[in-house]
Amino acid sequence: HRIARRQRQMCIRDRAKFTLPKVVDKFVKRYPNVHFQMHQCTPDESVEMAAKGEVDIALWTETTEKGENLVKMPCYKWSRSIIVPKGHPLASIPKIKLKDLSQYPIVTYVFGFTGSNDLDRAFFERGLKANVVFTATDADVIKTYVKMGTGVGIIASMAFNEEEDKDLISIPANHLFDSGTTYMGFRRGTYLRSHLFEFINMFAPHLTKKIVAKACATKSKKDLDKVFESIKLIRR
């Protein structure tokens, strides 16, 4: 009898819904004997569990100093959008400024989730304070509270769906906040079976077997960064 192998994947909620479904579907069809187990958690939890070897691969959305024993690989860039109900005053402003945004209560991600640290820093650097009244780990929850009128939402742009979110307006916020980066990582020294290489490449096509092997061979963060310095990441 063939023993099913297990791939333990850890990621945060929005990645599970907006970037992984097609990849997972393709993967499980190609490797029907590999049991795919996904955990949804915070970025810090992802990094910590990968560092302990409790999961094979982790995904997270913020630069972190944790997990020094991980091979950390950038996958793609992502942007933020402001979401408001139709008819909201912000929807009529040609180019929103942070000062405009600071006049309203804000609904966004929990601190440490999907680049919320960068959001706080953007306001601070301009001498402003974000009036965050509600936080959640899930973009769908944030959108629900925006529809209720609790506040203005700030979410990952990929989390907005024109078909499902017809009551809301999405306003690009690239000029207000730096782009975020989604990373993938695994514990240094992990033996990567062929199906793990395949999954990594399905999720981030620039992470070829050759590039991943180079990343694994590095001894320092500086060397690891050099592996990816000439690679232009796609934006989602």
Question: Model-found features: residue ranges?
Answer:
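Single conserved hydrophobic/aromatic residue that forms the stacking wall/gate
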Residues: 1-8, 12
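Short alpha-helix C-terminal cap/hinge motif
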Residues: 9, 15-39, 48, 121-125
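Short beta-strand-centered segments that line the small-molecule binding cleft or hinge
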Residues: 22-26, 43-80, 84, 147-150, ...
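Short beta-strand-to-loop elements that line the ligand-binding cleft
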Residues: 34-41, 61, 129-138
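Beta-alpha-beta core module
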Residues: 67-79, 140-189, 198
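Flexible hinge/capping segments at coil-to-helix
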Residues: 69-106
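Short helix-loop capping/hinge motifs at secondary-structure junctions, enriched
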Residues: 87-97, 176-178, 189-194
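Secondary-structure junction motif
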Residues: 91, 105-126, 192-201, 207-220
